Amino acid sequence: MKYDYLIVGAGFSGAVLAERLSSVGKKVLVVEKRNHIGGNCYDFFDKNGVLVHKYGPHYFRTNSDQVVEYLSQFTDWLPQEFKVRAFVKKELYPLPINRDTLNAFFRVNLKTEEEAEKFLEEKKEKIKNPQNAEEQVLSLAGREIYEAFFKNYTIKQWGIHPKNLDASVTARIPIRTNANDCYFNDKFQAMPKEGYTKIFEKMFEKCKVLLETDYREIKNKISYQNIIYTGPIDAFFNYKYGKLPYRSLKIKFENYKKEFYQDWAQINYPNDYKFTRIVEIKHVTKQKIPCTTISKEYPTWEGEPYYPVPNPNNEKIYQKYEREAQKIRNVYFIGRLAQYRYLNMDQVIKNALEFFEEMKK
């Protein structure tokens, strides 16, 4: 069979484009090197019947009506307010930092946003244009908050001192002066009712998917017109400009014969233990079963690529690959790995939908 599109990767970028192209009559072949669809969003029922996220928690949230409308074709939703705590000095504090965090941590009694703003103004360091992740936090919340909540967590998470990471790394986490303890501000926050894998199964219904397959081993054996590549861009070019670093995770799952292990879906451990956080995803999947599974995350440089490492040197390397990519006809690079960008799920989906619209022109 002759395919219009060979799509490399079965995560959200590949799935959206496979579904959209199939819907307009294009013949699509999806090739995935892993033994499952869904990329890092893949979830499954463990031996105890608990729905777990194999590659760490994926909390769905977005401000895009377009993304919600699109995904709602493939799933019903469980509305959520995702809430996270940080374990610091043997106490649990709301994350992101909010007025309650400030009151508890500094033993003060700030009652209004204005009082909290004034308090932070006295704590923060006067840095007009933060140049790195450390300066970003210091400019918003000051040294004490940085040292207690951000510094060691960032070092654990990235294996790099915050001074050597882009300000964007810590800018993702707001500092609030109100008492809002929701982890995200997005207007739509939910979990897919039957999990993420079910979404992908429906999205791939009209196209052929090959699992445990390296596209390089089959691309000369099949006929196709275009490639959509969602894998690591440096791998595509055989690392000719050097390897782009990705942070990965080793995740240890533990099952307990009780309804819940902890009171929150996620507790971060900035300063204690080698793991960064304990996640009990059952809090947000709303399963009603008498046991639970938690995951402990240990950041590492080995394993599946999770997070591009944002700093100026890596950006320079990526730009070299990006220029190479622009020279190739009928090969399209899209997604977190192909674009070497830290993208949330909704951003990946929106980018793929917009890319499809461009392709139709």
Feature annotation, model-predicted:
Residues 69-70, 145, 262-264:
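Structural/interface elements that position substrates and couple domains in central-metabolism enzymes
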